[in-house]
């Protein structure tokens, strides 16, 4: 795949992921917000509502990654093509999880989340530990 095309796909994937996350709460998908669904299923490991504010920091770091990726010279980042493809997959899985979650497909949302976590772990595996990419996806992975 040509690197310029991959850069465009990375940028568009990020923008679509952010837009879908925005829609999930501003115009709730399936008529219910992400937080309302979380509250619907009382579990022992659901964090307090304020802890979800970490997503602002995560998405800011992901934006920095996207800017670095899109503006980098071809080959400037180790495993650049693979990282771009894995990032696009992570965006698709993020959107897929939102759709499953909002339409109350809990088993499907769990499976998508597992794939999402595997994808984030794969990104970390192919990233050098000293760069912004590693920091970004370390925070994203949790």
Regions found by a protein language model. Name each.
Residues 1-10, 55:
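N-terminal membrane topogenic signal
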Residues 12-19, 86-93, 97, 112-123, ...:
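Alpha-helical transmembrane segments of multi-pass integral membrane proteins
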Residues 14-31:
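Alpha-helical transmembrane segments of multi-pass membrane proteins
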Residues 39-54, 133-140:
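Short aromatic-rich membrane-water interface segments that cap or initiate transmembrane helices
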Residues 48-68:
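Hydrophobic alpha-helical transmembrane segments in multi-pass integral membrane proteins
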Residues 67-74, 123-128:
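Structural signal for the C-terminal ends of transmembrane alpha-helices
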Residues 77-87:
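Membrane-interfacial loop-to-transmembrane alpha-helix junctions, especially the N-terminal start
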Residues 96-109, 127-132:
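Membrane-interface helix caps and helix-loop-helix hairpins in membrane proteins
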């Amino acid at each position: 795949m040509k690197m310029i095309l991959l850069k465009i796909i990375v940028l568009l994937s990020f923008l679509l992921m952010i837009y879908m996350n925005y829609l999930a709460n501003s115009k709730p998908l399936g008529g219910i917000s992400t937080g309302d669904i979380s509250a619907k299923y009382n579990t022992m490991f659901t964090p307090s509502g304020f802890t979800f504010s970490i997503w602002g920091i995560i998405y800011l770091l992901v934006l920095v990654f996207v800017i670095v990726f899109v503006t980098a010279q071809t080959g400037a980042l180790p495993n650049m093509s693979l990282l771009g493809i894995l990032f696009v997959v992570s965006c698709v899985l993020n959107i897929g999880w939102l759709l499953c979650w909002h339409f109350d497909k809990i088993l499907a949302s769990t499976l998508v989340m597992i794939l999402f976590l595997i994808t984030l772990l794969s990104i970390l595996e192919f990233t050098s530990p000293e760069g912004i990419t590693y920091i970004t996806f370390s925070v994203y992975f949790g």
